[in-house]
Amino acid sequence: MSKHKVYTLYIIVGVTMLLAACTMPAKQQTVGNKARHQFTNEVLLGYTPVKNQGSNPLCWAYSMLATIETEHIMMGDSVNLSVDYVARNMLMEQTRRHFLANGKFRINMRGTMPLLLRLLNEYGAMPYDSYNNRDINYKSLAKRMSTLSDASANMSILEERAERVLDDHIGALPPHVFMLGAEYTPQEFAHSVCMRNEYMAMTSFTHHPFDEMFVLEIPDNYNNDPFYNVPIDVLMNRIEKSIRAGHPVCWEGDITEKGFSFKDGVAMLGKEQPCTQQQRQTAFENRSTTDDHCMALIGLAHDKQGHRFYIAKNSWGIDNPYGGLMYLSENYIRMKTVAVVVKNM
């Protein structure tokens, strides 16, 4: 056994927590709220229109695509990417996996930020305007694909049936991508907007050594993607440095705190004070910090008292005081971050 103890944090109670994660809680679905907090924006990077994931657990895809979109806007480029294209390819991949595993692999639409990067690299990308459908229930579609897999005699029959179902529910795939008068394959287009190894996944926990990669033990990391482990001070510095340099950061973390309010557009801790590395670790191990939701961090701000906040682009629509953006306190980010994906600089 390794001298470094590895604690298995795949949680029995995690199944319960996952039911409420990623999508917007019903208690926060309030329209027309007036701003209760006033902020001064120090940095606000450009961003594409805020989208709405609805009841689909696809925040990891929306947030990572939003991060890539903002990265290109800050370079003077304009790109708006299709979540449906990514979701379709993921569904097809998982349907094959379910079939080959004799039904032992559960098809689901949850994931982590690095999963999006792998799917882009493997299957390509589509512009939002070329492939989008606002009325898809992906959880229901995943169940349909599972049933289809169980009823198929072989892979070729399964793939033919699955493609037909996906065409009917999401739409037929365009054979090519047309951008600025040029024609691309989906793979060529993806590589033009996100190169291999352009981004790095980072985290900060003490059950693994710092300055090493490890497979983060969270339920949605079923692909065993590795994250680079650093002290929390280093992680916070990297987040701020990236944003000030014009690079957005994809954020993955806990939204179960009472102080997280989409309807108010603010996330704060009950006790607004900096946490220690050990406090973060304790919260992760006792499940008071869980992997719930992903957003793109696109700015920095402060309130009247000078308290610092990070501006996040959410994917729950625009019905809050800041048009779908949220202000997360620095202490909230420090305590409740599970992982981030940053631009390799």
Sequence positions of predicted segments:
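Bacterial N-terminal signal peptides that target proteins for export
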Residues: 1-11
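Structural recognition of the beta-strand scaffold that forms the well-ordered cores
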Residues: 58-61, 85-88, 93, 116-119, ...
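Active-site signature of cysteine proteases
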Residues: 25, 48, 163-345
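C-terminal motif of bacterial Sec signal peptides marking the signal peptidase cleavage site
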Residues: 19-21
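Active-site-adjacent bridging/hinge elements
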Residues: 31-43, 90
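Papain-like cysteine protease catalytic cores
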Residues: 80-181
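Active-site nucleophilic cysteine motif
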Residues: 54-68, 107-114, 293
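Bacterial Sec signal peptide processing site at the extreme N-terminus
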Residues: 23-33
